Amino acid sequence: MAFRVLMVGKGLRALAARGLFDGESLVPVGPAEVDFAGALVAVQRHFPDVVLVDLSALDALPAIEHVMVERPVPVLALHPGVLSGQEAFQAMVAGALDVLERPANPGPEFWTHVSRKLVLLAQVKAVRQVQTRPPPQAAREAKPPPPYPLVAIAASLGGPKAVAQVLRMIPRAFPAPIAYCQHISDGFTEGLAHWLSNETALRVLEAEHDVLMAPGTVYIAPSGSHLLVRPEGRLELDAGPALRGFRPSCDMLLTSAGESFGPRCIGVILTGMGRDGARGLKEIRERGGRTIAQDEASSVVWGMPREAVLMGAAHEVLPLSRIGAALMQWVDVC
């Protein structure tokens, strides 16, 4: 069965005709030219399995957001090189599941890559966008350092929104640092850190080499480097080869967290394709730490969490809405 693709943006179908559609896995639907003002109407009329959006126009982001509120559908966004990583990341905030950089003169290899990505995203459930704000933080009594001085989080497709929901439940006075590995396009982690800083009460930074972690701070693995944690609480960036196709690798972060902090570590694996992170989560559990996997119903893609569950790596399998509270409970009990 071929998946139905709606293209939104001036001249996008003409560009894509160079190699996107083979008639077997993907077929175009809708008018040859769909502008952003007409995006929602086109989605409602033609029922695409996935939408391909060009980000070069100023009204692209509101159009994505409007579609995701009114009639959710998986969205892949293409951005030209003139956009910064932070600007392109805003497409993911609006609801796009992924963003790819479009070269000035894309050739067949690029469209083959886009085609494969569209086939994957067409099989992903879209989640309706709900605008939320961080809840007011209640005053908390000072407590001694917990025996869980580290929370390590791994996520892939759908991860930024999921992580934001978890972190909104955590106050600024959270007595542990949080190390976070997210599969995301190169150059977008700065935008992710900036967005999460505005969405949560926590301090959110791109991780830097040899930095001593601080409680109440989230450290994001930068694109192109593995993030590791050391027993004394320092971060290490490793530019070595990708592990099973990923750099940063969720497995490498979680494994180092388990090795370094053992029973003082809480590991969390959220929505994402594939199996990266499952082995690392099991390492945390085997060394006495506590572990959580997101449940299927609340995941955009139940791939990484499913693999962790099948391995016996998760103490608890929880809906996204309960993970933040679980982290607070486990830290507070200590």
From Swiss-Prot:
Role of this protein: Probable methylesterase. Required for the normal aggregation of M.xanthus cells during fruiting body formation. It is also a component of a sensory transduction pathway that controls the frequency at which cells reverse their gliding direction. It may remove the methyl group from the gamma-glutamyl methyl ester residues in FrzCD.
Natural source organism: Myxococcus xanthus
Boundaries of every CheB-type methylesterase domain copy: 147-334
An annotated Gene Ontology molecular function: protein-glutamate methylesterase activity
Keywords: Chemotaxis, Hydrolase
A Gene Ontology cellular-component term: cytoplasm
PANTHER family on file: PROTEIN-GLUTAMATE METHYLESTERASE/PROTEIN-GLUTAMINE GLUTAMINASE, PROTEIN-GLUTAMATE METHYLESTERASE_PROTEIN-GLUTAMINE GLUTAMINASE
Record-linked Pfam families: CheB_methylest (PF01339)
GO biological process: chemotaxis
The keyword Repressor is assigned to this record: no
Active site (UniProt): S156, H183, D276
Record protein name field: Protein-glutamate methylesterase FrzG
CDD domains referenced in this protein's UniProt entry, alphabetically: CheB_Rec
InterPro entries: CheB-like, CheB_C, Sig_transdc_resp-reg_Me-estase
Catalytic activity as recorded in UniProt: [protein]-L-glutamate 5-O-methyl ester + H2O = L-glutamyl-[protein] + methanol + H(+)
E.C. number: 3.1.1.61
Protein's UniProt keywords contain Hydrolase: yes
